[in-house]
């Protein structure tokens, strides 16, 4: 359709402009004019411009002065914000839903995250996992005790070798005794180190099942919860960013679980244990230096890590945006190719990568600063405590073995301390990563079923549908359904037609309870759908959608998805009913043929046939058909409709139609207009009604056929016979041309 020209006038007399914009035809636009200025005063005016007829001179002026007009448009675009006025919402349309996840998701406090994680580590319904946790803690205690014994064994070995404090080694006195004691102590030293390592590895082995089970349960709960959220959430989410956040959060679970149970708590315990030993064996000065060093180390680590957290947040944000941009671009591969925008997409993706690179460099440089500060603090503390030990040896209060013991105790803490810094840093970052994961679990769905809701009792014989004064709006103040009432008798075929945005597809979504009407009630078999369980409700409904989206798997999997318990023979049978079986067998891999991302390797007709077949396989009492052939050619549409006729025989069915020729055999046709049922009746009755909206729609779609009939002089029966013969020949030629290629609807 030809583009239309719209004149926008700023209504201030002092400064009046006329801007001519080339805009695609649509219903209406809201235009916010931000450029109206009079004596320094800003005015904002909202106007609605209907795009109707155009003055021919304006159209002519566009072609004669194209360059100047283009410049004016670019200048005007800086001052105008054009927003499509919508009264409905379709998932693949250009409208906007005010459900930004940034506004919906509220962050969960870290304490709540830790509390929730502990409930997975110590589950009430898994005594076997609780036993594993108890055994792991016992092994941890054994590892710490044997670890503390190592410096003492080293001390006793040195003291045995150096029998007199402050003197050189004297091995002439009782050499056999010294050798025996030294050997025993050194063996004890080796056993202590090996025992500590053994306890640690056994602990990791026993606790591994606990950690992996927790990860599995959390990930499954998040996945299931996402499927239980309402459609509004999923229409507003960003798939790339969400998948990145879930992936990072899941990876962080294992680290945080191990860190909390086996690193942070035990390391703090070991710090106080070492300080107590130093106080008891060496005096208060040693304990004070040790506690001071450890406290300074911990405080420095916490403060710097908290400061560094913002760089990790920036890095995660850039990572999310880069992932989302990549997925969005790859999903729209064909569109990118249509407009030769590969370089633009690469540059856009690289822009996000630059942000990630900048944030990552900040994270790396601040990590180097943190590591150096930790090493400096520990080195100062170690030097101070060694000086105190040297003074004690010089004064005769301590032995060389005491010096070795003090050095060993503090050095043994260096590893968990260094790891403590890493653990705290990574735990903080993991908690940030896990925030979205646990926040998703806190998102509450707007569609809820009642407690102990009974299942929907429905059979094909009593499968009635009744809308009772239903009002619904996606956005406040813009009603899509405005008091709709109708009934579909059991076993009847009812069609719903109307213009774009009249609420046809909304009726399907309300039946599935993807949304809840603001007013009114919906009944199936006399039962209010709000009073029955969601699972039983959706089990009773089958749908052939307008856009049949398939899983990235083989054809058999996508067919069997209608009933995952169906046998292969049942799958083959529904494929035959949908006219798909022979075409599949002609494909190189038959039913194992991969359909590609969202089924893009199949034609539109093949995807629709798969959708029909799996709807047949589901075998629901009620079938919904949502404009499934609106984008297909006439022959493919006719073949699909032939498949559908057998399927809906003696079954309650609702056909939402764009092409009226597909619903002429409906028992009743409902015509929606402005959110209400404007007309109802059979096809012929509506055509015979003077001035009916349905007749107007029918005549508009069939104007070419009607004109050709008026100009023809052949008898009606002869013309129909000739047309039928031509149609059959054309269909036969098409089928022969694709024979062997596997495409049943070229």
Swiss-Prot record:
InterPro entries: AAA+_ATPase, ABC1_TM_dom, ABC1_TM_sf, ABC_transporter-like_ATP-bd, ABC_transporter-like_CS, P-loop_NTPase, Type_1_exporter. It is found in: Mitochondrion inner membrane; Mitochondrion. One of its GO terms (biological process) is negative regulation of reactive oxygen species biosynthetic process. Residues 465-699 form the ABC transporter domain. Glutathione binds at residues 308-312, 371-374, 421. Disulfide bonds: none annotated. ATP binds at residues 474, 498-505. It is a multi-pass membrane protein. The chain crosses the membrane at residues 134-154, 177-199, 253-273, 284-304, 376-396, 403-423. It comes from the Eukaryota. Keywords: ATP-binding, Membrane, Mitochondrion, Mitochondrion inner membrane, Nucleotide-binding, Transit peptide, Transmembrane, Transmembrane helix, Transport. Residues 133-429 form the ABC transmembrane type-1 domain. Residues 708-728 are annotated as: Disordered. The keyword Nucleus does not apply. One of its GO terms (molecular function) is ATP hydrolysis activity. Residues 155-176, 274-283, 397-402 are mitochondrial intermembrane. Residues 1-19 form a transit peptide. It catalyses: (glutathione)4[2Fe(III)-2S] cluster(in) + ATP + H2O = (glutathione)4[2Fe(III)-2S] cluster(out) + ADP + phosphate + H(+). Exports glutathione-coordinated iron-sulfur clusters such as [2Fe-2S]-(GS)4 cluster from the mitochondria to the cytosol in an ATP-dependent manner allowing the assembly of the cytosolic iron-sulfur (Fe/S) cluster-containing proteins and participates in iron homeostasis. May play a role in iron and lipid metabolism. Homodimer. This is Iron-sulfur clusters transporter ABCB7, mitochondrial. It comes from Oryzias latipes (Japanese rice fish).
